[in-house]
Amino acid sequence: MGVYLAVLFSLLVIEMAILFILVLPLPQRMRRWLYIRYSIISTNKKFRTYMVGIMIFVGLLFIDSWKRSQIRVSTYRNQKNPYIINSVTPVDALASRAYNQRNVYISGFIIYFYICILTVMSILRRIVEWNDKMKAGDDILKEKLRRKQKYLEELQKKKF
């Protein structure tokens, strides 16, 4: 139980750190570097297989914990007959419910952050591509400006 919880927490912390770095206002060079690294990693078939497997396990944990945390809890004794056995939910059942609710929260946040990372990387890809197009457009515009300046100089020479 301790190892699997440590793995879940470490996965959650890693995802939070990645998302934090991605949303920082970094310079364009750093954004491009992050996007290139993400592209390299995401095209690796082994990595994608591992990530899909991990997310399937986390999703199954989420569903299982959700179902197990939906037990009916009774904290009061039966008023009509207070001597009925098991009229109050046992402490073990309450503890199990609390553990399952904790697992729902942790696995839900892992899934949520994974979706957020994919979304932010999509936005980052668009930003990097848009800036590359702008730079390419700048070069084209500079070349057009040079040609027009040459043409203007030629016209001025012809005038005199």
From Swiss-Prot:
Domain remarks in the Swiss-Prot or TrEMBL record: The di-lysine motif confers endoplasmic reticulum localization for type I membrane proteins.
Keyword Hydrolase: no
Membrane topology of this protein: Multi-pass membrane protein
Compartments reported by the entry: Endoplasmic reticulum membrane
Descriptive protein name: Endoplasmic reticulum transmembrane protein 2
Main location (coarse class): endoplasmic reticulum
Function: May play a role in anterograde transport of membrane proteins from the endoplasmic reticulum to the Golgi.
Lumenal topological domain residue ranges: 1-2, 67-103
Side of membrane Cytoplasmic, spans: 24-45, 125-160
Family recorded in the similarity comment: Belongs to the BCAP29/BCAP31 family.
Pfam family name, one: Bap31
Motif (Di-lysine motif): 157-160
Segments passing through the bilayer: 3-23, 46-66, 104-124
GO biological process: endoplasmic reticulum to Golgi vesicle-mediated transport; intracellular protein transport; protein localization to endoplasmic reticulum exit site
Organism (species): Saccharomyces cerevisiae (strain ATCC 204508 / S288c)
Coiled-coil features, chain-numbered ranges: none
Record key words, sorted: Endoplasmic reticulum, ER-Golgi transport, Membrane, Protein transport, Transmembrane, Transmembrane helix, Transport
A Gene Ontology term for the protein's cellular component: endoplasmic reticulum
